[in-house]
Protein backbone atom coordinates (compact mmCIF):
# COMPACT_ATOMS: atom_id res chain seq x y z
CA UNK A 1 0.00 0.00 0.00
CA UNK A 2 2.94 2.31 0.60
CA UNK A 3 3.83 1.91 -3.08
CA UNK A 4 0.35 3.08 -4.08
CA UNK A 5 0.55 6.09 -1.78
CA UNK A 6 3.91 7.04 -3.27
CA UNK A 7 2.41 6.60 -6.75
CA UNK A 8 -0.39 9.00 -5.81
CA UNK A 9 1.70 11.67 -4.13
CA UNK A 10 5.00 11.44 -5.93
CA UNK A 11 6.67 14.86 -6.07
CA UNK A 12 7.13 14.43 -9.83
CA UNK A 13 3.43 14.38 -10.74
CA UNK A 14 1.55 17.42 -11.92
CA UNK A 15 -1.41 18.58 -9.88
CA UNK A 16 -3.70 18.09 -12.89
CA UNK A 17 -2.72 14.40 -13.05
CA UNK A 18 -3.57 13.74 -9.40
CA UNK A 19 -7.30 13.28 -10.06
CA UNK A 20 -6.65 10.72 -12.82
CA UNK A 21 -4.10 8.89 -10.69
CA UNK A 22 -6.48 8.83 -7.73
CA UNK A 23 -9.30 7.43 -9.86
CA UNK A 24 -7.00 4.84 -11.44
CA UNK A 25 -5.67 3.80 -8.03
CA UNK A 26 -9.20 3.61 -6.64
CA UNK A 27 -10.30 1.32 -9.46
CA UNK A 28 -7.21 -0.85 -9.05
CA UNK A 29 -7.86 -1.25 -5.32
CA UNK A 30 -11.57 -1.87 -6.01
CA UNK A 31 -10.60 -4.62 -8.46
CA UNK A 32 -8.22 -6.18 -5.95
CA UNK A 33 -10.76 -6.08 -3.13
CA UNK A 34 -13.53 -7.50 -5.32
CA UNK A 35 -11.25 -10.29 -6.47
CA UNK A 36 -9.96 -11.13 -2.99
CA UNK A 37 -13.03 -10.66 -0.79
CA UNK A 38 -15.63 -11.41 -3.45
CA UNK A 39 -14.60 -14.07 -5.95
CA UNK A 40 -11.78 -15.77 -3.99
CA UNK A 41 -13.79 -15.82 -0.74
CA UNK A 42 -16.78 -17.32 -2.54
CA UNK A 43 -14.64 -20.06 -4.07
CA UNK A 44 -13.13 -20.84 -0.65
CA UNK A 45 -16.62 -21.52 0.68
CA UNK A 46 -17.30 -24.09 -2.05
CA UNK A 47 -13.83 -25.63 -2.19
CA UNK A 48 -12.30 -25.64 1.31
CA UNK A 49 -8.87 -27.17 0.75
CA UNK A 50 -6.53 -27.89 3.65
CA UNK A 51 -3.28 -25.95 3.87
CA UNK A 52 -0.06 -27.88 3.13
CA UNK A 53 1.38 -27.57 6.63
CA UNK A 54 -1.89 -28.82 8.16
CA UNK A 55 -2.12 -31.65 5.60
CA UNK A 56 1.43 -32.76 6.44
CA UNK A 57 0.87 -32.37 10.21
CA UNK A 58 3.56 -29.68 10.53
CA UNK A 59 3.70 -26.34 12.30
CA UNK A 60 3.21 -23.26 10.15
CA UNK A 61 6.27 -21.12 9.48
CA UNK A 62 4.08 -18.02 9.67
CA UNK A 63 1.03 -17.21 11.77
CA UNK A 64 -1.73 -18.88 9.76
CA UNK A 65 -4.99 -20.48 10.87
CA UNK A 66 -4.80 -24.15 9.82
CA UNK A 67 -8.60 -24.32 9.57
CA UNK A 68 -8.82 -21.52 7.00
CA UNK A 69 -9.09 -22.82 3.42
CA UNK A 70 -6.05 -22.35 1.21
CA UNK A 71 -7.66 -22.33 -2.24
CA UNK A 72 -7.34 -19.83 -3.87
CA UNK A 73 -4.64 -17.66 -2.34
CA UNK A 74 -6.02 -14.31 -1.24
CA UNK A 75 -2.57 -12.70 -1.32
CA UNK A 76 -1.92 -13.89 -4.88
CA UNK A 77 -5.40 -12.76 -5.95
CA UNK A 78 -5.06 -9.28 -4.45
CA UNK A 79 -1.59 -8.47 -5.74
CA UNK A 80 -2.16 -9.86 -9.23
CA UNK A 81 -5.35 -7.82 -9.50
CA UNK A 82 -3.42 -4.65 -8.66
CA UNK A 83 -0.62 -5.50 -11.09
CA UNK A 84 -2.91 -6.30 -14.01
CA UNK A 85 -5.06 -3.20 -13.53
CA UNK A 86 -2.04 -0.91 -13.59
CA UNK A 87 -0.55 -2.72 -16.59
CA UNK A 88 -3.82 -2.41 -18.51
CA UNK A 89 -4.12 1.27 -17.64
CA UNK A 90 -0.69 2.00 -19.08
CA UNK A 91 1.23 2.37 -15.82
CA UNK A 92 3.93 -0.10 -16.87
CA UNK A 93 6.59 0.61 -14.21
CA UNK A 94 4.18 0.27 -11.31
CA UNK A 95 2.40 -2.64 -12.99
CA UNK A 96 5.61 -4.61 -13.50
CA UNK A 97 6.77 -3.84 -9.97
CA UNK A 98 3.48 -5.19 -8.61
CA UNK A 99 3.66 -8.19 -10.96
CA UNK A 100 7.11 -9.11 -9.65
CA UNK A 101 5.79 -8.58 -6.11
CA UNK A 102 2.84 -10.90 -6.79
CA UNK A 103 5.18 -13.62 -8.06
CA UNK A 104 7.56 -13.27 -5.10
CA UNK A 105 4.69 -13.28 -2.60
CA UNK A 106 3.28 -16.40 -4.24
CA UNK A 107 6.61 -18.22 -4.13
CA UNK A 108 7.12 -17.20 -0.49
CA UNK A 109 3.67 -18.48 0.51
CA UNK A 110 4.36 -21.85 -1.11
CA UNK A 111 7.82 -22.01 0.52
CA UNK A 112 6.25 -21.22 3.91
CA UNK A 113 3.87 -24.16 3.47
CA UNK A 114 0.67 -22.13 3.69
CA UNK A 115 -0.34 -22.63 0.03
CA UNK A 116 -0.13 -25.25 -2.65
CA UNK A 117 1.24 -24.02 -6.02
CA UNK A 118 -2.24 -24.40 -7.52
CA UNK A 119 -3.65 -22.04 -4.85
CA UNK A 120 -1.25 -19.37 -6.06
CA UNK A 121 -1.90 -19.95 -9.76
CA UNK A 122 -5.67 -19.85 -9.21
CA UNK A 123 -5.29 -16.62 -7.25
CA UNK A 124 -3.27 -15.08 -10.05
CA UNK A 125 -5.90 -16.10 -12.61
CA UNK A 126 -8.78 -14.72 -10.52
CA UNK A 127 -7.00 -11.44 -9.82
CA UNK A 128 -6.10 -10.95 -13.48
CA UNK A 129 -9.60 -11.82 -14.68
CA UNK A 130 -11.40 -9.50 -12.25
CA UNK A 131 -9.08 -6.59 -13.06
CA UNK A 132 -9.53 -7.19 -16.77
CA UNK A 133 -13.33 -7.09 -16.39
CA UNK A 134 -13.29 -3.96 -14.21
CA UNK A 135 -10.88 -2.24 -16.61
CA UNK A 136 -13.05 -3.09 -19.63
CA UNK A 137 -16.25 -1.97 -17.88
CA UNK A 138 -14.82 1.43 -17.03
CA UNK A 139 -13.12 1.78 -20.43
CA UNK A 140 -16.43 1.19 -22.21
CA UNK A 141 -18.24 3.66 -19.97
CA UNK A 142 -16.06 6.42 -21.39
CA UNK A 143 -13.94 6.87 -18.30
CA UNK A 144 -10.42 7.58 -19.40
CA UNK A 145 -7.76 5.45 -17.74
Regions found by a protein language model. Give the residues of each.
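Membrane-interface loops
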Residues: 19-89, 102
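Terminal transmembrane helix and immediately flanking juxtamembrane interfaces
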Residues: 1-40, 44, 100, 117-145
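Membrane-embedded catalytic cores of phosphoryl/pyrophosphoryl-handling enzymes
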Residues: 62-145
